[in-house]
Amino acid sequence: MKYQMNFTTSFDDVTRFTSAEDLRRFYKEHGCDGLEVMPLAYSTKEAPEVYQEASVCPLIQPDMVTGVHCCCLQDWMNQNKEELITHYRKDLDYATRMGAEYVVFHVVQVDGEESFTYQMKHTNREVIDAAASFINELLDGQTYHFWFLMENLWWPGLTFENPEDARALLKQVHYEKKGFMLDTGHYLHTNLDLHNQDAAVACLHQMLDNHKDLIPYIKGIHLQESLTGEYAKQWLADAPHELPEDPAESFRVVYEHIFQLDRHEPFTAAGVKGLVERIDPLYVTYEYITRSREELAEYLERGRLENI
């Protein structure tokens, strides 16, 4: 089992570290073997408005990268397929250059309006069928060697609420080294009545009970908790919500709402270690959203399995 810290090549993340060795010392000090990298546009303190390819980021060396998280598009089903292929191949090529052992791909379809209003336009199975077809277009005939791990969210797509949906996704995807990346916090969003981490662990065990035959396919875990059911209930009670007409303002309020929902905080309940042991994945990524290097260090220590 390998342990990763999530990291992006964005300005907010890279400016926390002074060099590749500084970054390496940091994640090793906090119990990680390497990084799960999302290759976003790279910029520096000296020129924050100049965006460069992720591959030029000097902080990240190939021997530091265990996994690559694709820069996933949540609203994609009506977009041009050739452009989508180009978008994702760029990330897959980055993963290949870095020697990544796995990549992560979101199986979801949601637009800004849906995430804001909760009025969904597709069923889980519709999204799963479309995603499987697209994944086959993306991967068929290629010579990739990494695991292709499909991640759950709480919007239409792979949610782990129905084992038949997960089985259908696996069955339809041709790629041999396929599996799941279970995001624990994302799954918790499917139950708005959870109020503490012990209940969250029990909820995840119940999901595993329902997916027993699929547990061997869970090759990775994004280990985090996000108990925001009360926020979601209040949001729904205050409906209807209308998006601003201005695109920039609309983008801002949607993501402000999403970050209130999906907090990515340390999962520290006593039962978390047993949950991970039950799944026995190849990879565990401590996937957090933090505001500083100091907060990231605090989160990594709190969520570190050996400290629970």
Go through each PLM region and give its residues.
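Active-site acidic/histidine proton-transfer and metal-coordination neighborhood
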Residues: N80-G179
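Distinct, well-ordered alpha-helical segments
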Residues: T15-R24, A47-E53, A132, E137, ...
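Hydrophobic faces of well-ordered beta-strands that scaffold small-molecule active sites
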Residues: K2-D13, D33-V37, P62-C70, V103-F105, ...
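Alpha-helical scaffold elements within enzyme catalytic domains, especially in hydrolases
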Residues: R25-E29, Y94-R97, E137, Q172, ...
